[in-house]
A protein has these predicted regions:
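Class I S-adenosyl-L-methionine-dependent methyltransferase catalytic core
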Residues: 1-492
Length: 492
């Protein structure tokens, strides 16, 4: 019955309902049935993952308009076989389609191939909604670049979410996919794209395969000089994990009454800063397990009632989660030396620092606020190198400066009554950070720090009045680091 109605009402849009006799015309029902079967058949294979945007649009239009071929065995076998064996060919078609989609009205787009900056038009409609026929080209570009980077593009379905974030941040360059792409969206519906030079020449190399005489040789060679404005990262989260994170939902925090006869059902949480996974846990358990680690690393606390689980935060995680969607990665622990201060250790250090009302304070390696959360926000300046961690700190209400502390300290004219810090330890950075922080302490001020064990045997701050705690083990999960607490007073 549904196919009779869908097939014979299609196109009427409610303005004209055909006679009842027409509702049961067989051709309309068969057209609806054909479209439904073709949709299911294509979804059962991975050809949609490989199809370039133009082919996807063509198939989607045939199915939507119910003009798909008859769903007969010979036709289905022949069509699916051809599509499956064309997957390699689709790769070059995808690159060609991306190039042809570039705006011809902007001189930034060069006719001889892909350049560093490109412009695509009509990506959003007048209401700011993604134009899916056009955003598919950006999706194709991301999948091609993913292949260049050795990433599995299966599950890459976050492009429209990313473009929506870009539009919400109109006029701002945002970096995506580990630095492979930069995107700037505009309210009029246009986006500007910047491609990493290592990716642009590879795209041109494929384009030259299709159009040998059109692409000059210099555009098909790897750049000899390293790009100064691009930093390419390769330790990226799988797209399947990013997809799970992109689908996170917020659990209701108010009682719900489904009907008048039923008592209101209380919410499982009253914390508005909560997130839960969409769907069932067995859909992609590996991706969900990795996504769970991401939420925990952002400070989420896993809660449950029987089998139902969700995560609660003490800040709004929306912007931090958006940044992960964009960059495709978490900050590297090794690079940023991010080992968050435990509650016990932070409380001990802040108790010794004894911050008083009106004193100006500095946390020079703030991370996600392990120490700063215990310091008076109105009196405290946080410095943090990781953009993602800065988003978390801002969401918590901290005053944040996004900078490398060792680069910021020599140029700032700010001085502080109290510095509280847990600096990175590797490659002598603890001492470098300590010395830089000491220069920012006012005369008569004080500094409280967590440092590697053994630091107490060195005269790190000559002329200061220093006291040290006993060595402490097991204070940072997953490490064998032994630490000491330093309390140092600068002479007047």
């Amino acid at each position: 019955m549904g196919h009779f109605l869908r097939g014979n009402l299609h196109g009427s849009r409610g303005y004209h309902v055909p006679p009842v006799s027409k509702l049961f015309d067989l051709p309309g029902a068969l057209a609806s049935l054909n479209a439904d079967f073709w949709q299911q058949a294509l979804s059962l294979t991975d050809v949609y993952e490989y199809m370039p945007n133009d082919r996807r649009n063509e198939w989607n239009n045939q199915i939507h308009e119910m003009k798909a071929p008859d769903f007969e065995e010979n036709a289905v076998r022949a069509t699916l076989t051809e599509l499956l064996f064309s997957r390699q060919k689709f790769f070059s078609e995808r690159v060609d389609g991306i190039f042809r989609s570039l705006s011809r009205s902007h001189v930034t787009n060069r006719p001889e191939g892909f350049s560093k900056r490109m412009i695509l038009e009509y990506m959003f409609d007048q209401w700011g909604t993604c134009n899916y026929d056009r955003t598919g080209y950006v999706d194709d570009l991301r999948k091609v670049i993913a292949k260049f980077m050795g990433r599995d593009a299966t599950g890459l379905n976050t492009t429209n979410k990313i473009l929506k974030i870009a539009r919400d941040r109109s006029g701002e360059w945002i970096t995506i996919d580990g630095g492979a792409l930069r995107v700037k969206a505009f309210q009029k519906g246009t986006i500007h794209l910047e491609i990493h030079p290592d990716m642009a020449w590879r795209l041109n190399d494929i384009l030259a395969f299709l159009h040998p005489a059109a692409i000059p040789a210099e555009h098909r060679q790897k750049p000899r000089t390293k790009a100064k404005t691009f930093e390419l990262h390769t330790n990226l989260l799988p797209f399947s994990v990013l997809s799970v994170l992109g689908d996170l939902q917020t659990e209701r925090t108010e009682p719900e009454q489904r009907n008048r006869r039923e008592e209101p059902r209380p919410p499982v949480t009253t914390n508005p800063y909560n997130r839960r996974f969409k769907g069932y846990s067995d859909e992609n358990p590996a991706a969900r397990a990795e996504a769970e680690k991401v939420l925990l690393s952002l400070g989420g606390v896993k809660m449950n009632i029987n089998a139902f689980t969700w995560f609660e935060f003490d800040y709004d995680p929306a912007t931090a989660l958006e940044d992960i969607q964009l960059s495709g990665a978490l900050p590297e622990l090794k690079t940023h030396q991010f080992y968050p201060t435990t509650g016990e250790l932070a409380a001990q250090l802040l108790d010794e620092a004894d911050i008083r009302e009106g004193e100006t304070c500095l946390e020079p390696s703030a991370g996600m606020g392990g120490l700063a959360d215990l310091m008076p926000k109105a009196q405290t300046t946080c410095v943090e190198i990781s953009p993602l961690h800065c988003r978390v700190l801002e969401a918590k209400g901290h005053n944040v400066i996004e900078a490398d502390f060792l680069a910021w300290a020599p140029v700032t004219d700010q001085r502080f009554d109290v510095v509280v810090m847990n600096p990175p330890f590797s490659e002598g950075r603890a001492v470098a950070h300590l010395n830089a922080a000491a220069d920012l302490v006012k005369n008569g001020g004080r500094l409280a720090a967590i440092l590697p064990a053994g630091s107490d045997r060195k005269n790190l701050l000559p002329g200061w009045d220093c006291s040290w705690s006993a060595p402490m083990e097991g204070m940072f999960a997953g490490t064998g680091v032994c630490v000491v607490r330093l309390m140092a007073y600068k002479p007047d």
